[in-house]
């Protein structure tokens, strides 16, 4: 038995030049996290779906030049982050962020509290700079490590950790009471 790490199947497919198969595997393994990430950054399911499609299209085009730095998940989230930023710039939509989706069908006291908490979080997130919001979404929604976030935002790991820490501090300041 050996302790050698197994190569990522997507990287293996890329090395073999099997880009179509690699893309299909990306969709299966990372499609859901891309959807959640784009939804959190854009606040609209329709926009998030469009952003995921554009992310996968750009990833497919970039596959021949993939350098293998970091994880595929971090690479894809980095592309998604750029796609979402471009969509926000060009469309200039004042949509709310949907980091904490709450179904509208439940009318109980708990549902009301959850909706109020979600609204407070969206409002606090809207006060952050896009770069601060991005790292929080990559960390809490996409589940990326600080190393993976560093790759996604093209900075070293220490800078990524610092950005996450500062963004959390600003978010805590923006939230009423002890909501976080």
Description of each model-found segment:
Residues 2, 100, 114-115, 120-123, ...:
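C-terminal edge and immediately downstream basic/flexible tail or linker adjoining helix-turn-helix-like DNA-binding
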Residues 61-68, 78-99, 113-114:
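Arg/Lys-rich amphipathic alpha helix in sigma70-family domain 2
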Residues 36, 50-57, 70-82:
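Structural recognition of an alpha-helix C-terminal capping motif at a helix-to-coil junction
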Residues 27-45, 62, 125, 174-177:
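Amphipathic, Lys/Arg- and hydrophobic-enriched alpha-helical face
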Residues 15-16, 43, 54-71, 90-94, ...:
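Sigma70-family region 2
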Residues 126, 130-134, 142-162, 170-173:
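Helix-turn-helix DNA-binding module
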Residues 1-33, 40:
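N-terminal module of bacterial RNA polymerase sigma factors
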Residues 30, 51, 163-168:
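Residues within the DNA-recognition helix of helix-turn-helix
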